[in-house]
Regions:
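Glycine-rich phosphate/pyrophosphate-binding loop shared by adenosine-nucleotide-utilizing enzymes
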Residues: 156
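Signature of long, low-cysteine stretches enriched in small and polar/charged residues
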Residues: 98-150
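A short acidic-to-branched-hydrophobic micro-motif
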Residues: 64-95, 142
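Residues in well-ordered beta-strands of folded domains
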Residues: 79, 130, 159
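N-terminal targeting sequences that direct proteins away from the cytosol to non-cytosolic compartments
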Residues: 2-9, 16-71, 81, 111-121, ...
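Generic solvent-exposed, charged/amphipathic alpha-helical segments
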Residues: 93-101, 178
Length: 187
């Protein structure tokens, strides 16, 4: 599983780097919840804003990963593992955070983060992480939310990340995904 997290790090760092630029010029659009799109494949389904795109979707019996981008630079990551081999949410979030903090960003850095447990919502356990991404002297505070729950025989992890100033535009989309995520009909 560590290899899978490492593979995501490069993609995420590119998003972070671009995100700092976008955040400086406030290019994030609000999540468009009118006529949401629907993902229904690989035993799961969920709705997501019509102005967001799934940019990666890979699935094996051991690992399922979906990477989604907003119109700005916020991201959503879905990962699932067989529940009998999945890590706890605490371990998963710490490992993910450490990998991101240790990864080098050209002309910048990610600050040490703070992780804290948040109340359970929609059946998901949660951990919130706050950190700063700094590039060429511009520091942008970010929030990453880790959520987890068992769906069928899989342990599902959702990761929602956005600049704190973009939370009002992205949170409705994050909530739509969280609240509609379920096992596909007929699975």
């Amino acid at each position: 599983m560590v290899k899978k997290l490492s593979a995501l790090c490069l993609t995420l760092l590119i998003s972070f780097w671009g995100g700092c630029y976008d955040e400086t010029f406030d290019l994030t659009e609000a999540a468009d919840l009118t006529e949401p799109k629907e993902y229904n494949s690989n035993q799961i389904s969920f709705k997501y804003p019509k102005n967001w795109e799934i940019s990666a979707d890979s699935n094996t019996t051991a690992f399922h990963n979906i990477y989604m981008q907003t119109q700005g630079e916020a991201i959503v990551i879905y990962q699932s593992y067989p529940s009998d081999v999945a890590e706890s949410l605490t371990t998963f979030s710490k490992d993910f955070s450490e990998k991101m903090t240790q990864t080098e960003i050209p002309m910048g850095e990610i600050s040490q983060s703070e992780l804290k447990t948040i109340p359970k919502v929609a059946g998901f356990e949660g951990i919130e992480e706050t950190f700063d991404i700094s590039i060429i002297g511009i520091s942008v505070p970010h929030k990453r939310i880790f959520l987890s729950k068992k769906i069928a025989d899989r342990q599902v992890f959702l990761i929602f990340q956005a600049a704190i100033e973009d939370q009002p535009q992205t949170e409705p989309g994050f909530n739509l995904i969280r609240d509609t995520l379920k096992e596909s009909e007929g699975s």
